[in-house]
């Protein structure tokens, strides 16, 4: 009977969130960008045409969303697949936000390359290579700035949708999850069909060792974990969530699990019913990962929604690469597409809009 009561309570919360998302006149999307020099490690990230270009991807993503072109580099960020390219997920987000007529705010949590658009800065430091054990130099500053903005936005809006753009983010997420004691090896997703789990684990273990962190025996707090093997977007998003008091859609996969783990570390009794994760079917069905297995370790009340844009029906060759395991998610794509669908768009209308934006 207690279980049935809890399930009914969850259904009420779900309906409440969906109703809020349908009816609210002023939801806002927050795209949090950052850099980790971990992305320069060969073979780790596909979020760019080369390792060097991964540092430009976050800035280019938001320039593309706002300006319709890129100023910080010569070409649009992309994943090269044979003779075609997989469009950046920022274009999926852009299409969905335009369809749903939702404004957005850019948050620079710590990007080495600064975008040529207006943004809110959470600090001047970008993320370092986590193998050093000093991945983020100013995690508390970023977190506190996130809390302040989260509180301010809660006074202006009824709902927040939060996404991130940071190449190698699944590796830094693995680092934070492991540092906080979660079993995440072989469970984080990635931007390529071949998920380099061994490389990710080796990178994280080297960082933990150099930070003198032993998760099995040490009582590691959230800022310590982020400072050692995290990236700037994680404390930024955790701060935004903790600082706010309104419903939130987290658009993403593995990185959002790490954010939830950080929140749980800071506030063990945090009410996760206020948070819903929305991600793509490409993450949810990733056979090389286990997002659900990670989330279950953190809190059973975290709700996750899966969005399928039906790219098997597209004639856009680049978008078809999502079906074979490239890219999968990023820049809040899952959350933005979920929002567009809840607010009245059909899947076909959404896909057609994405195709036009990606031309």
What residue spans do the PLM features occupy?
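Single conserved hydrophobic/aromatic residue that forms the stacking wall/gate
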Residues: 1-12
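N-terminal loops that bind phosphate or other acidic moieties
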Residues: 11-161, 167-359
